[in-house]
């Protein structure tokens, strides 16, 4: 697996047990079981990713026009193109190369506008933009092939690009076959690189077991669902199940909650990627929302996050490890900036739209809705790379309306 940038390496391998406790023997015993279970998977709807397009179009058509426009049409007067970023730079310190962010935002906004609002200009713009990046072999080179954060930048850009490609390009015969083929080769190459370099279920390295692995698995899951590649889906499912197995019984993720002032920030990060994987699996008839190891499941992770936001002291005993905490050194000052839309247009709670649509009757969903409204009354639309794009356009369901509720995995 990849090494983290030297300047932010954790002093972790020798003292990980201080933060996590001994490795849960459940994890090792699950590996053989998961290998057997993988052979039982099948894809119910290959070609679909986050939702069934025809069903979502019908639901959007049933919304008032003003609501649909607000959710899906972006406040953009003129869509601008951006030059392909062929080489991802290894940036010093905390974070990563941000030169792909403008591309990603355009892809997310224009993709939703094209799909949900029928915006032809947005569709033309995003098709041209994705084609330009494919032709420019964007993100295919890494300045430092050992830098985990560089792969992370690629994957957070890649997920919404795959989703928008699915919604606007793939299968559209109005687009030249050669253009579609070039885009598909470009995307597939990036996905396969992530699978080969970022996912190792036998590794104990941090980036193989934390939010990095979950994001990579989301990318692999999306491509596997789209192309009908069962092997890729099996890989993503295995990463999800390992994450649940390594969760603490209280719902916290050890490698996220040890992150000092950003303990809840990274708990939310993990929940976001796992929710996306579970939703893509549900579309394919695979129940990951209901997957449990003892009392551990995704719902418990969501509940821990909500409890920690309500009373940050609940995470202090883990956060005090203060491992790679970011700009704030005091672990007692939990960074809750993810509760509001960021200055660059993203809302890091966009995953909640997926969860609330899937489980409208759960207490966690009601708490999420109240929390988001309290933090920022006009919080929709929510757009974020880690959730695949504009989840409000893709998932919002009015209160009381029939949504995507799944009975599996619900706990009263």
Q: What does each of the following model-derived ranges do?
A:
Residues 11-19:
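Bacterial N-terminal signal peptides
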Residues 24-202, 214, 282, 290-412:
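Extracellular glycan-targeting catalytic surfaces
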Residues 140, 230, 246-250, 288, ...:
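Alpha-solenoid repeat scaffolds
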Residues 277-280:
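Amphipathic, soluble alpha-helical interaction motifs
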Residues 152-268:
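Active-site cradle of extracellular carbohydrate-active enzymes
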């Amino acid at each position: 697996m990849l090494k983290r940038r030297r300047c932010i390496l954790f002093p972790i391998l020798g003292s990980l047990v201080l933060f996590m406790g001994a490795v849960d023997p459940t994890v090792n015993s699950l590996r053989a079981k998961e290998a057997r279970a993988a052979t039982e998977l099948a894809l119910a709807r290959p070609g679909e990713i986050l939702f069934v397009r025809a069903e979502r179009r019908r639901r959007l058509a049933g919304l008032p026009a003003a609501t649909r426009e607000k959710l899906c049409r972006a406040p953009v007067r003129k869509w601008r193109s951006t030059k392909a970023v062929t080489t991802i730079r290894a940036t010093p310190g905390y974070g990563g190369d941000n030169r792909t962010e403008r591309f990603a935002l355009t892809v997310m906004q224009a993709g939703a506008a094209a799909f949900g609002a029928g915006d032809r200009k947005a569709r033309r713009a995003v098709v041209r933009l994705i084609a330009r990046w494919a032709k420019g072999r964007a993100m295919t080179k890494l300045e430092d092939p050992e830098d985990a954060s560089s792969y992370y930048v690629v994957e957070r850009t890649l997920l919404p690009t795959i989703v928008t490609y699915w919604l606007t390009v793939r299968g559209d015969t109005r687009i030249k076959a050669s253009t579609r083929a070039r885009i598909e080769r470009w995307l597939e190459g990036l996905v396969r690189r992530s699978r080969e370099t970022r996912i190792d279920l036998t590794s104990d390295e941090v980036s193989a077991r934390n939010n990095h692995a979950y994001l990579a698995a989301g990318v692999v899951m999306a491509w596997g669902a789209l192309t009908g590649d069962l092997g890729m889906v099996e890989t993503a499912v295995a990463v999800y199940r390992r994450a649940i197995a390594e969760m603490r019984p209280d719902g916290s993720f050890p490698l996220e909650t040890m992150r000092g002032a950003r303990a809840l920030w990274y708990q939310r990060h993990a929940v976001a990627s796992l929710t996306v994987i579970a939703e893509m699996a549900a579309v394919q008839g695979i129940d990951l929302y209901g997957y449990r190891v003892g009392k551990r499941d995704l719902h418990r992770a969501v509940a821990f996050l909500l409890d920690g936001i309500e009373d940050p002291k609940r995470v202090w005993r883990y956060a005090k490890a203060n491992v790679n905490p970011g700009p704030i050194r005091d672990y007692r000052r939990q960074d809750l900036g993810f509760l509001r839309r960021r200055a660059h247009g993203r809302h890091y709670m966009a995953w909640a739209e997926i969860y609330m649509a899937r489980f409208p009757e759960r207490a966690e969903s009601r708490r999420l809705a109240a929390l988001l409204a309290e933090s920022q009354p006009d919080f929709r639309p929510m757009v974020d790379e880690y959730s695949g794009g504009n989840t409000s356009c893709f998932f919002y369901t009015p209160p009381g309306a029939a949504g995507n509720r799944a009975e599996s995995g619900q706990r009263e």
